[in-house]
Amino acid sequence: MYVAVKGGEKAIDAAHALQESRRRGDTDLPELSVAQIEQQLNLAVDRVMTEGGIADRELAALALKQASGDNVEAIFLLRAYRTTLAKLAVSEPLDTTGMRLERRISAVYKDIPGGQLLGPTYDYTHRLLDFTLLANGEAPTLTTADSEQQPSPHVFSLLARQGLAKFEEDSGAQPDDITRTPPVYPCSRSSRLQQLMRGDEGYLLALAYSTQRGYGRNHPFAGEIRSGYIDVSIVPEELGFAVNVGELLMTECEMVNGFIDPPGEPPHFTRGYGLVFGMSERKAMAMALVDRALQAPEYGEHATGPAQDEEFVLAHADNVEAAGFVSHLKLPHYVDFQAELELLKRLQQEQNHG
């Protein structure tokens, strides 16, 4: 007979103590500091900030430490903390054209105004384990040079000026805020992009990959990927003019997608857009690919792949929600299982006597 069992508070406290001990690890080894995580695991910090919805490197590093390096748990911690924060102001729209560039590449033009900047990247490495890191070797040395950044307009703006793409203009409508109003489907472009930015990187990467394998009409080129620092400004009510309050390291991706030939308009390329905190380049590219796939209805395209189904994609992109729903299966379901068990036994008895 299956009966309900109550877990004791002492057992739960002991489980938490065990987890804390595992998180700390061998006490003979130096403890990993939040500053070390922030500086040396910077790409993990970038992901937690992006999907956690807070652009604070120290808090993201703290969440990673507390979560024993579990990205999804760290994102959950950051989301929970975010709910306690007051909304003090709304920043002015970010101007990525004025980005202080750390990296900028284009796969469609070799020579672009402002030039290409390779920047920090794992591209072109051989993906061989570097065993010298086991010896806690010397810090790498860099040779730096001061140079003035040239104006670097977006590659898509160059295409638009040639009539090869459409300018995207601000409609003036108030953007949705998915942190205050739950999204409904079909949703606006602003809501869609917010959900994609906070969506799980692995999930979006898989969907983006599916569009490349034929599950969705998509023939992309990396028009431009740029990473760098963007000024953030607000307009205080008592002043009435914009005041710079800091800067953010962000990565922006614009994908040049297959052209369309709409009636009454010249044929032109379409685009997908991605924007993330830090240098999460893979996430930005995946976001841009899925963004374009979700624009299928706007271009009158027949949806042939899961990446083109807006509600399916966006309703399942949030890893905090997904992890929570899957994890709830670990909670006691004794009564539910007992009901199914009794039903199964009754069906078997009816079959045996039938």
Curated annotation (Swiss-Prot):
GO biological process terms on file: organic phosphonate catabolic process; organic phosphonate metabolic process; organic phosphonate transport
Highest taxon listed in the record's lineage: Bacteria
Pfam families from the UniProt entry: PhnI (PF05861)
UniProt KW keywords: Transferase
The EC number(s) this enzyme carries: 2.7.8.37
Keyword Transferase: yes
GO cellular component terms given for this protein: alpha-D-ribose 1-methylphosphonate 5-triphosphate synthase complex; carbon phosphorus lyase complex
InterPro entries: PhnI
Keyword set includes Cytoplasm: no
Catalytic activity, reaction form: methylphosphonate + ATP = alpha-D-ribose 1-methylphosphonate 5-triphosphate + adenine; ATP + H2O = D-ribose 5-triphosphate + adenine
EC top class named in words: transferase
Molecular function in Gene Ontology: alpha-D-ribose 1-methylphosphonate 5-triphosphate synthase activity
Function: Together with PhnG, PhnH and PhnL is required for the transfer of the ribose triphosphate moiety from ATP to methyl phosphonate. PhnI alone has nucleosidase activity, catalyzing the hydrolysis of ATP or GTP forming alpha-D-ribose 5-triphosphate and adenine or guanine, respectively.
Family assignment from sequence similarity: Belongs to the PhnI family.
Subunit structure, interactors included: Forms a complex with PhnG, PhnH, PhnJ and PhnK with the suggested composition PhnG(4)H(2)I(2)J(2)K.
Note: The sequence shown is that of strain K12.
Protein name listed in UniProt: Alpha-D-ribose 1-methylphosphonate 5-triphosphate synthase subunit PhnI
